[in-house]
Amino acid sequence: MAEITTIARPYAKAAFDFALEQNAIENWVEMLNFAALVSENETMQPLLSGSLASNQLAELFIGVCGEQINEQAQNLLKVMAENGRLVVLPAVAQLFVEMQHEYAKEVEAQVVSATELTSEQQQEMSASLEKRLARKVKLNCSIDASLIAGVIITAGDLVIDGSVRGKISRLSDTLQS
């Protein structure tokens, strides 16, 4: 995963800098997400790792994307095809979105809870995280009954495990050592 991220980062950074300069970040998010979906398509996968010449692969890929991508995005895809990097498009799209959030001082927090959180609980959690992270927080909530009770919050590098399952696991580890 780290290798893919290392390969994808310069492409994402170049695209983000260009999109920022052109004031077209949202448009680029849509184009990169669409291109990433195309690259993940099961019909396209063998072609990306196949023996097509880079210019043929780029033209084929751009043809499949059609009107969904503009000329500048086509140029990015051509460069990536020349370097054999179209397979990392999903990582490029993901890194681009992360750069967008970083630029906007936003962070997405994944919240997994044992039961559904009320809107009041979500608001309190969001406010608390915004204060702690000094960023605007967008919560993505999901439910996992195996937590027994409590929540697990993941926001960037921050992980807060306040679940009963996590506490039992830590207690078990302590008793076994």
From Swiss-Prot:
Q: Name one GO cellular component term.
A: plasma membrane
Give the UniProt family note: Belongs to the ATPase delta chain family.
Entry-linked InterPro entries: ATP_synth_OSCP/delta_N_sf (IPR026015), ATPase_OSCP/dsu (IPR000711)
**UniProt-listed HAMAP family:** ATP_synth_delta_bact
What gene name is listed for this protein?
atpH
Output this protein's name. Answer: ATP synthase subunit delta
> What's the superkingdom here?
Bacteria
Q: Which SUPFAM superfamilies match?
A: N-terminal domain of the delta subunit of the F1F0-ATP synthase
Keyword check for Amino-acid biosynthesis? no
Signal sequence annotation: none
Q: List the top taxonomic levels of the source.
A: Bacteria, Pseudomonadati, Pseudomonadota, Gammaproteobacteria, Alteromonadales
Q: Name the job this protein performs.
A: F(1)F(0) ATP synthase produces ATP from ADP in the presence of a proton or sodium gradient. F-type ATPases consist of two structural domains, F(1) containing the extramembraneous catalytic core and F(0) containing the membrane proton channel, linked together by a central stalk and a peripheral stalk. During catalysis, ATP synthesis in the catalytic domain of F(1) is coupled via a rotary mechanism of the central stalk subunits to proton translocation.
Q: What Gene Ontology molecular function terms does this protein carry?
A: proton-transporting ATP synthase activity, rotational mechanism
Which keywords, in A-to-Z order, does the entry hold?
ATP synthesis, Cell inner membrane, Cell membrane, CF(1), Hydrogen ion transport, Ion transport, Membrane, Transport
Q: What quaternary arrangement does the UniProt entry report?
A: F-type ATPases have 2 components, F(1) - the catalytic core - and F(0) - the membrane proton channel. F(1) has five subunits: alpha(3), beta(3), gamma(1), delta(1), epsilon(1). F(0) has three main subunits: a(1), b(2) and c(10-14). The alpha and beta chains form an alternating ring which encloses part of the gamma chain. F(1) is attached to F(0) by a central stalk formed by the gamma and epsilon chains, while a peripheral stalk is formed by the delta and b chains.
The entry's localization annotation reads:
Cell inner membrane
Pfam families recorded: OSCP
Membrane topology note: Peripheral membrane protein
